[in-house]
Amino acid sequence: MASTCVPVLTRSRPELADALATAPGPRAVVMTMGALHQGHLDLVAEAARRVGAHGTVVVTIFVNPLQFAAGEDLDASPRTLRADVQALGDALTGPDGALVVGRLVVFAPTPEVMYPGGQPAVRINPGPVATVLE
């Protein structure tokens, strides 16, 4: 059996910029929170089909703390980066062992990378309508 191609793993904005600076052809992005399953891999395969052999697929893996409300368990959200990167490489490796796209880039930042000044606080005051709709 042929070996699996390894995606380019980036963890910071400069690393991502460097990876994309030389990335070939058209690009497609698939945004995820990780813990990839077949549905994610199908989206990545479709992205690869659309950009073709000379394009670049970027997969983001970011568990965004802003997506969790107070009382929801951010810490319980699975973190499976190593397995996710392996699954992506497996999914986009052709029968000859070559990557089926020009480049596969994984961007897996930490919250500190995404929010260098700390998490932004957004407050929305919907006014009196909120009391009616609650």
State where each predicted segment sits.
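Nucleotidyltransferase catalytic core that binds NTPs
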Residues: 2-134
